[in-house]
Amino acid sequence: MMQRHERPQAASHPRADALRYDDNLTTERPTFVSHLECAATGERYPADELHNLSRAGKPLIVRYDLDGVRTALTKEALTRRAPDLWRYRELLPVRRTGDIVSLGEAVTPLLAMPKLSARRGAAELLVKDEGRLPTGSFKARGLVMAVSMAKALGVSHMAMPTNGNAGAALAAYASRCGIRSTIFCPQDTPEVNVSEIALQGATVYRVNGLIDDCGKIVAEGKAKVGWFDTSTLKEPYWIEGKKTMGLELAEQLGWQVPDVILYPTGGGTGLIGMWKAFAELEAIGFIGGKRPRMVAVQAAGCAPMVRAFEAGVEHALRWEDAHTIAAGIRVPQAVGDFLILRAVRESKGFAIAVEDDAITAALDEAAREEGFLMCPEGAATYAALKQSLADGRIRRDEQAVLFNCATGLKYPLPPVHRTLDRTKPIDFAAL
């Protein structure tokens, strides 16, 4: 039996009057990128040039001089920095502050869910609420880094496929720095997402297909008109933005890691990025060797990673007829499938699929019991936790962290039909 975790002291941050709000965006700090590396072959590529996939057709990973980072960055130094994503500058790829494109990427809260924990008999259930980020989702982490690096490397036109939230983030950050953006989304993408993308300056098209069909259009356009393909894992810097979830989480837990992380998995950059973050934190002496078990959560209507994990293979076949209410994880085939599966297996975690009915029930329960409106993808992680506690894959004495990847306000909400006629007598006892 594991010992219960001692609740960590909250990380101290500077007083509001101790430094300017934009200190992390204007203070030049040393950067330590050494090179890029093919995730499959290990082939090295120069860091300060524009890249998509490696020659092997696989994602490129940013590597750092971690000995240099270890010398330059201390935990104590972090306590004197403003609480935003850019506080970890030594572990990020943007070299010049002038290239940072920011909309205020604040550290997102880690919220206890005591009622849900008690209901499930779980030791400690925490949710990292990524809906507090610009454009209302964790896609802001990846796209702020991708766009900042695109600006640094002279890109003038970016294109991408999206199920909604990533497109909104690209549109916002690209407009912020004057880069043109063209975005393609499936025909059934919610109107609120498409309108948000268009309002923030992108040219957006609905496509009669799924996100990978949209991706094919982006790839064809790259060859024909030369825009930069910003598809998930087809450029190196989304992962670097997403890994800040792991950096933040470890700091919020007093430089510890939880027992289990449940992560809504489509393209998987966040899961891959956090796994990278924990390795880098250990290398610079900020955490020990313990790792959380990484759980890739998918919808039963689109679960290529679950199928590949259970089959014991390294790559996932395309999932045909993909469908789920959690559109953000409706990704039939992921470029980084082998990296997702590698992280899950190395961590001794697992992949799990949940039905749409279970997602809806989890969303309703979190809102009703905790006053916390999750997005469907985030609710999928709570549904997966319930399922895993019931079947024993997660023990009740383990500390579990769920990721709510967007605000629930960006999604269609159920209608409310109750009305009251003010001109008639009101039976207040019946209200």
Regions of interest found by a model, annotated:
Residues 24-431:
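PLP-dependent amino-acid enzyme catalytic core
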